[in-house]
Every structure is written in C-alpha cells, then in structure tokens.
Amino acid sequence: MAKLILTHEVTGLGAAGDVVEVKDGYARNFLLPRGFALTWTKGGEKQVESIKAARAARAHASVEAAQAQAQALSSKKVKLEVKAGESGRLFGTVKPADVAAAVEAAGLGAIDKRNVELPNHIKSVGSYTANVRLHEDVSAVIDLEVVAAK
C-alpha cells in the first residue's frame, strides 16, 4: 500500500489535500503519472496544509461569485421570446435550456441548464419565476417574462 497526498480531486478517493492509502499499482500507474497525487513524506504535512488552504480560498471565492450572480439575477427580469399562437399558447414549452440561454443573452452570466428548476411547464405567455442553483449554498429566483415572438 502506498501513502499519497492528493493534489486534485479524484472521484471515489478524496479531495485535494487528503492523505490516502492506495494499492501500489494504482499509485504508480494512474495517480502519480497524471499528477493527481504526490508521495507522502514527513515534510508532506506542510504541503497538505497549503493545498487545503488553497482549496478553502477557492471555495470562498466561488461562494462570493455565486452570491454576486444571484443578486444580479434577482434584480432583473429576463425576457424570453417564444413562438406562440394568437391566443397566447406556445408552440411547445419553455425548457431549462431556454431559460439558461436567455439569461446569458441578457448579459447576466452563464448558468448551467441542469441547475434551472421550473416550477411547472410553461405553455403560455405571461410572467413566471424559476429557481437557479448557482452553488451548493446559493440559489436565486429569476423573474421570467414570456412573450410571443414576432
């Protein structure tokens, strides 16, 4: 068994800065050549501390960025132009991908379509709200204005 310090997050093994014990072949053939880990040494404790400090700083920065984007998203109304009939019924429905594209087109930053939660199917023009998960701890509510395309 080889004792290693992870330098990157490895699925099923741990996060950067974790000290793990793995089989020699896994360490020699996968983790070490790809730079995912360093061999454990007595001076490795300092490396572990610096890796964990860098990870904490990145996590703090990502939370702050997500909070800033959430504030920007909540303060603006996003307009979606969709093909619709004369009665206001849409030809299809508004999907999370449509909302993500409209947010990016409005200049409010890129969001992942998988993080958009629509409360119900949007099948007619009008005003709606959608929830967006920007981070593990941060979410925003977007006001949507669905209008008929000309």
From Swiss-Prot:
Instruction: Enumerate the GO terms in the molecular function aspect.
Output: rRNA binding; structural constituent of ribosome
Q: Which InterPro entries match?
A: Ribosomal_bL9 (IPR000244), Ribosomal_bL9/RNase_H1_N (IPR009027), Ribosomal_bL9_bac/chp (IPR020594), Ribosomal_bL9_C (IPR020069), Ribosomal_bL9_C_sf (IPR036791), Ribosomal_bL9_N (IPR020070), Ribosomal_bL9_N_sf (IPR036935)
Coiled-coil spans in chain = none
Q: Which GO terms describe its biological process?
A: translation
Cellular component terms per the entry's GO annotation: ribonucleoprotein complex; ribosome
**UniProt keyword terms in alphabetical order:** Ribonucleoprotein, Ribosomal protein, RNA-binding, rRNA-binding
Q: Does the keyword tRNA-binding apply?
A: no
Stored Pfam families: Ribosomal_L9_C (PF03948), Ribosomal_L9_N (PF01281)
Q: Domain of life here? A: Bacteria
- Which family does this protein fall into? Belongs to the bacterial ribosomal protein bL9 family.
Function (record text): Binds to the 23S rRNA.
Q: What is this protein called?
A: Large ribosomal subunit protein bL9
